[in-house]
Regions:
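Active-site C-terminal subdomain of aminotransferase-like
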Residues: 1-86, 91
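PLP-dependent enzyme catalytic core of the Aspartate aminotransferase-like
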Residues: 32, 96, 108-179
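Generic non-transmembrane alpha-helical segments
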Residues: 47, 51-55, 88-99, 144-154
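Active-site lining segments that contact anionic ligands and/or coordinate catalytic metals
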Residues: 63-67, 88-90, 96-99, 122-127
Length: 179
């Protein structure tokens, strides 16, 4: 039993990681210190940010090496914070282009006052993270094209209402409906 556990789940001190997974982590750690890889990653992320910025998408600037952050509050300036402009953009990107992103705004960080009114987060951002070794140039170009449609239809987006939320960490499991 112990031998099979080590083969399939890894040694007890590996934290449940198999040898294959630990090798993948080691390769990843080596790759991220390669100057050529780092340059490629940063240039790819900046390319995405620059191209959508040129189209008029408000982003946090300058762009870093991991992700592009879209300012959903500025993009959807007609949507009040209590209708969650960041989450609305997350949903639009997924529905229009199948692009998975994450809201970093009032869904994630908003709270309620004693009267049950939303205390909005200071920013309504959407993170377009670029995972390592996953996307090619054509994938990045596709995301840029999807923003053409997002911009074309932005006034039609009215926001969302939370219809079900847990007490804690609501950004993981809340349910929404379109307004």
């Amino acid at each position: 039993c112990t031998q099979m556990l080590i083969i399939t789940e890894g040694f007890a001190t590996y934290g449940g990681l198999s040898g294959r997974d630990m090798e993948a982590i080691a390769v990843g750690l080596e790759e991220v210190f390669d100057p050529n890889y780092l340059k490629y990653r940063i240039v790819s992320t900046q390319y995405l940010g620059e191209k959508i910025r040129e189209k008029g998408v408000p982003i946090i600037y300058p762009v870093g090496g991991h992700a592009v952050y879209v300012d959903a509050k500025k993009l959807y300036d007609h949507i009040p914070a209590h209708h969650y402009p960041g989450q609305a953009l997350v949903c639009e990107l997924y529905q229009v282009g199948g692009i998975r992103t994450v809201e970093i705004g009032s869904v994630m960080f908003g709270t309620y006052d004693s009267g049950g009114h939303l205390i909005a987060a200071p920013m309504e951002l959407v993170r377009l993270a670029i995972p390592r070794r996953v996307y090619t140039q054509s994938h990045i170009d596709y995301v840029i094209e999807v923003f053409d449609e997002i911009l074309r239809t932005k006034e039609k987006v009215k926001g969302l209402r939370i219809i079900k939320e847990p007490k804690f960490l609501r950004h993981f499991t809340s349910h929404f409906e379109k307004l």
